[in-house]
Amino acid sequence: MAVSTQQLAEELQIFGLDYEDSLLEKLAELCVLYRQTEDGMVSELIAFCTSAGKTCLTVDILNSFEYEVLNKKLSKAWHSASKDSGHAGTRDIVSIQELIEAEEEEETLLSSYTTPSKGPLKRVSSTPETPLTKRSVAARSPRQLLSPSSFSPSATPSQKYTSRTNRGEVVTTFGSAQGLSWSGRGGSGSVSLKVVGDPEPLTGSYKAMFQQLMGVREVLTSKIEELGSELKEHHKIEAFTPLLVPAQEPVILLGQIGCDSNGKLNSKSVILEGDQEHSYGAQIPVDLSELKEYSLFPGQVVIMEGFNTTGRRLTATKLYEGVPLPFYQPTEEEGASEQTMVVVACGPYTTSDSITYDPLLDLIAIINRDQPDVCILFGPFLDAKHEQVENCKLTSPFEDVFKQCLRTVIEGTRSSGSHLVFVPSLRDVHHEPVYPQPPFTFSELSREDKKRVQFVSEPCSLSINGVMFGLTSTDLLFHIGAEEIFSSSGTSDRFSRVLKHILTQRSYYPLYPPHEDMAIDYENFYTYAQLPVTPDVFIVPSELRYFVKDIFGCVCVNPGRLTKGQVGGTFGRLYLRRQPKAMDGGGRQGLSVAAQVVRI
């Protein structure tokens, strides 16, 4: 169907609507995509602008017009065609995909009967309302593949989400973000992605649910001894004293913070559990009344100095500071790229009152517009806590819904060329709910997509062009913050305290006992959930308020979640600049990071 940009311009001039010349091509594409004539498209556009009180056509207005008018009109036509053809008004996601594949097979069969001089034959639609036309559009449009009827007969778009007025608002900024275009090079730039492990990263499933208490005890003891050895060397401590040995002079003890009961830790219930080498795993109560400042949580490995005159109670007078790991040193090839744009977003990708994936589709549109070099997507993609999932109201198996969601993201961003990194979550209802969590598996990737799509474990350390990213979808801020106790003479930021704990404890999840939502396999935890280095950028999504902070030279980002209940949430974007010849005070290659958290 040929569309004339000149005729579109004439129609717009008739109604006196101002516009940018660059928008005519976009308007022509919409005419082809939604099978509209020039005058019909302009008439609907004028009606939309008039009702919205707009006198000038902009990119944002055109995007809103496509979303609020054209897509809804197309969805209604799809339902009407489904009813007229004698089928149920809703199709699940499997049946839609089968129809698309069947159509492609028929077109392939028709083309096999043509001569090379002729073009491939296409089936002709008798009217624009036939289901075939809608399937053709659905094959190209991510919004149609993830239409409300794909998952649940009762699915309707969230009214609060669609009526939001603050989309695109920048809510927090870090670094020199002023003047940046916030657009990447997509597939045109060279991107090096490498998963880093100590000794190796988690790449597949493992046998869980079989660990003995002695095995857990050995892991925790090893953590105490290894971290204690590092702190001993750093603080130049001669020797540790056993916990239960009485002494009249000050003693220095190594151990792990615990609680003397099953309740929440408080200043009166703190105990110190010693290591095997010095204290044989003994425990001793701790009196914190002499400490002016402290921040403690269960599972924290600490070195304390104080008095233990009876061998039954330690009166702590000093708490030694923890020390983070050194930074990652990239190779010459990894550090060759000078600038990289990264987008990070965390699920859920649906609002709590609807199973429609409108927020995810809006994110796909942003990826195609900005063309970031890398886009990191954290689960959950199909949230186990969603009401319709809990009540089993979906018409398709969880695995099928997830695969279609994944397929839509991959195909929908193909034109941008952006590299995609998928991080699972323990809230992904279809995936293995064990920590550390193995990567997703998806066998339907094409050869081209395999070059730009990567599935990683939870948690994961990922080098992007020599910049080390720490990635985790677990809400560390909430889990540790809920168990922490602290005392400070001045103002203190809880987020900064928790982040310092994570970096100095050198673990992606240092809390013990873990949160009730966590099913931890400690044998694999010891292998795959430790920080191999201090990351340059640490992504820590949380239900708590978004932020960007510099902790020990590590840029820590909480991008928030893409949805918050029934309303839209936030996502993050980072702009990284390498300065190969510059070195910072920590002996690492110069790195400049600008970051923003933006409303979807």
Swiss-Prot record:
Post-translational modification note: Phosphorylated in a cell cycle-dependent manner, in G2/M phase.
Spell out the Low complexity composition-biased ranges. Answer: 139-159
| Chain positions found as Phosphoserine | 126, 141, 147, 152, 154
Molecular function GO labels: DNA binding
Residues bearing PTM Phosphothreonine: 127, 130
Localization per record:
Nucleus
Which taxonomic lineage does the organism of this UniProt entry have?
Answer: Eukaryota, Metazoa, Chordata, Craniata, Vertebrata
| UniProt-recorded name of the protein | DNA polymerase alpha subunit B
Question: Per the similarity annotation, which family is this?
Answer: Belongs to the DNA polymerase alpha subunit B family.
The highest taxon in the source lineage is Eukaryota
Job description of the protein: Accessory subunit of the DNA polymerase alpha complex (also known as the alpha DNA polymerase-primase complex) which plays an essential role in the initiation of DNA synthesis. During the S phase of the cell cycle, the DNA polymerase alpha complex (composed of a catalytic subunit POLA1, an accessory subunit POLA2 and two primase subunits, the catalytic subunit PRIM1 and the regulatory subunit PRIM2) is recruited to DNA at the replicative forks via direct interactions with MCM10 and WDHD1.
